[in-house]
């Protein structure tokens, strides 16, 4: 019988050793099952499942609705607030003319009473102060009489109907106006919790140049663009899921047209 020939091994060949891992029999593998009623779920962000207080839900729904629904131009203009730098300049100027606090008022009245007792007039002790005017009815009358030199309107007044007519009134009367963020910020200016509107009627001679420069900047953003802003509706911004659905439909329609 012919002898069986063995093929010589390849040179420099390395013999592969089967890797055998020794398992400890004391440790049993327990794969996790994250189905309902099975293993404890891993920690993840569950904030979207939280039942928030009603006021939080309402403000979230209001925000979403203002993005989704079509918003008329008269209301949509309140989303175009004054830029940060110009707003800082405006508040810096108005802070110089803050109304007096209750302690300052008490001190002034005491001085006036002492002056009157001495036979002088109250004007001799305390001349007429130059302060920021606030209060919706008061500011509206100042605008109608063209006494206001600058009007700041809050963008988050609720209900918005209280101030929705003010930009049109300011435009008609030629009074410079600006829409700023935060009724609370305007409220701080006049020592109140909130304020819908604040106005300057006069300033000291040292601040005339600063006021005129500020007014020219504000007019460029509001009064000069008033007619343009009247034509632009707001809202109509859909969420990511709705946009994905629309894109998917458009893609399917395009594919159907190309195959036809």
UniProtKB/Swiss-Prot annotation:
GO cellular component: cytosolic large ribosomal subunit
A Gene Ontology BP annotation from the UniProt entry: maturation of LSU-rRNA
Predominant location: cytoplasm
PROSITE patterns referenced in this protein's UniProt entry, alphabetically: RIBOSOMAL_L7AE
InterPro entries attached to this UniProt entry: eL8/uL1-like, Ribosomal_eL30-like_sf, Ribosomal_eL8-like_CS, Ribosomal_eL8/eL30/eS12/Gad45, Ribosomal_eL8/Nhp2, Ribosomal_eL8_euk
SUPFAM superfamilies from the UniProt entry: L30e-like (SSF55315)
Keywords, comma-separated and alphabetical: Cytoplasm, Ribonucleoprotein, Ribosomal protein
Keyword Iron attached: no
Region annotation Disordered: where it falls in the sequence: 1-34
Molecular function as annotated in GO: RNA binding
Localisation: Cytoplasm
Family, as annotated: Belongs to the eukaryotic ribosomal protein eL8 family.
Function: Component of the ribosome, a large ribonucleoprotein complex responsible for the synthesis of proteins in the cell. The small ribosomal subunit (SSU) binds messenger RNAs (mRNAs) and translates the encoded message by selecting cognate aminoacyl-transfer RNA (tRNA) molecules. The large subunit (LSU) contains the ribosomal catalytic site termed the peptidyl transferase center (PTC), which catalyzes the formation of peptide bonds, thereby polymerizing the amino acids delivered by tRNAs into a polypeptide chain.
PANTHER family, sorted: RIBOSOMAL PROTEIN L7AE FAMILY MEMBER
Subunit structure: Component of the large ribosomal subunit. Mature ribosomes consist of a small (40S) and a large (60S) subunit. The 40S subunit contains about 32 different proteins and 1 molecule of RNA (18S). The 60S subunit contains 45 different proteins and 3 molecules of RNA (25S, 5.8S and 5S).
Protein name: Large ribosomal subunit protein eL8A
Gene source species: Candida albicans (strain SC5314 / ATCC MYA-2876) (Yeast)
